[in-house]
Amino acid sequence: MLNEVLKGIEGLDNDMILKAKNRVDSLAKPLGSLGKLEDIAIRLSGITGNMFNNIDKKCVIIMSSDNGVEEEGVASAPQCVTLLQTKNFIKGTTGVATLAKSNGTDLMVFDVGINSDEVVEGVINRKISKGTKNIYKEPAMTYEEAKKSLEIGIEAVKIAKEKGYKILGVGEMGIGNTTTSAAVLKALIGCETSQVVGKGGGINNASFEKKKRIVEEVVKKHNINFDDPIDIISKVGGYDIGAMTGVFLGAAFYRIPVVIDGFISVVAALLANRLNPLVKEFCFTSHKSQEIGYELAIKELGLDPMLDLNMRLGEGSGCPIAFSVIDFATAMMNNMATFEEGNIDNSYLEDVKDEECYIVL
């Protein structure tokens, strides 16, 4: 499945992008005056191949898994919180769940590696094992397990497509996963440890220093093939990160627009884009995460955050917010009149199309 997807991803529909841009420029407004909404609408058309789109059926896919490195004391919460919060996703009481309910967004929650035998009703069970190994002592998983995590993410998109979802978000739950994400990002781009390690959910200074030391050491000790994103996941990543990477790959393959949440989500998007550089064309950002490594990762991906709300929750919480903005972009494209439809003579625009200036109607 994985190789088929990697080879089967095609780029945006450039003919439709040109048509969509011409449509946007013909709308009864000063050129470019709706800013990023115009860019969003145009790229959405390039993804779907349709001039007019709607995202009335929305879903955040959440990958839950435990990380063995938690036993090193790098997280503020105990490991049992992964299972508890996964249950709360289903109850609708977490941050992402309450935001999602406000604009009709559904959640699709997967157990890819929670350290528990408990079966949670409403959670899709794709458990690879009960948590990864402690990356401070040994590789997180085997190479085959890493590939399996990616394929679970791809399968999740296939399920979402069959259910009729028109836009996806990518979230997670896994105590310790800011540590694994920081290690993955450091391995991917070769940066300083201090540039990628933050305090995650909130840890004291001693734990923070330990977290930085662990990330520094694990990237050196496991004989990582830095040119192979799957090997990076297997050595220092997590099942959650791998499955999220698969969601981004699947979204590009099935041509469904997909929204990046925060730090862990953007690291997964970057991994997917390293596996196939067309992936980022299908990605929309949401918010600028306050977790320190986010800025490096989004810059490496070549995208800009849509919003800056001082958020750092994770879970996919930024995705429903971005869905609303994307909804506004589709409303503009679908419902706004052109100059011709509004009986407005737009000949005055000919003098300014190639100049950097603004016109107030």
UniProtKB/Swiss-Prot annotation:
Keywords: Cobalamin biosynthesis, Glycosyltransferase, Transferase
UniProt key word Glycoprotein: no
EC number: 2.4.2.21
One MF term in the entry's GO annotations: nicotinate-nucleotide-dimethylbenzimidazole phosphoribosyltransferase activity
Entry annotation: catalytic residues: E315 (proton acceptor)
InterPro entries registered for this protein in UniProt: Nict_dMeBzImd_PRibTrfase, Nict_dMeBzImd_PRibTrfase_bact, Nict_dMeBzImd_PRibTrfase_N, Nict_dMeBzImd_PRibTrfase_sf
Origin: domain of life: Bacteria
Enzyme class: transferase
CDD domains associated with the record: DMB-PRT_CobT
Gene Ontology biological-process annotations: cobalamin biosynthetic process
Reaction(s) catalysed by this chain's protein: 5,6-dimethylbenzimidazole + nicotinate beta-D-ribonucleotide = alpha-ribazole 5'-phosphate + nicotinate + H(+)
Keyword check for Glycosyltransferase: yes
Pathway annotation from the record: Nucleoside biosynthesis; alpha-ribazole biosynthesis; alpha-ribazole from 5,6-dimethylbenzimidazole: step 1/2
HAMAP family on file: CobT
NCBIfam families: cobT_DBIPRT (TIGR03160), PRK00105.1 (NF000996)
Family: Belongs to the CobT family.
Known function: Catalyzes the synthesis of alpha-ribazole-5'-phosphate from nicotinate mononucleotide (NAMN) and 5,6-dimethylbenzimidazole (DMB).
Full protein name: Nicotinate-nucleotide--dimethylbenzimidazole phosphoribosyltransferase
GN (gene name): cobT
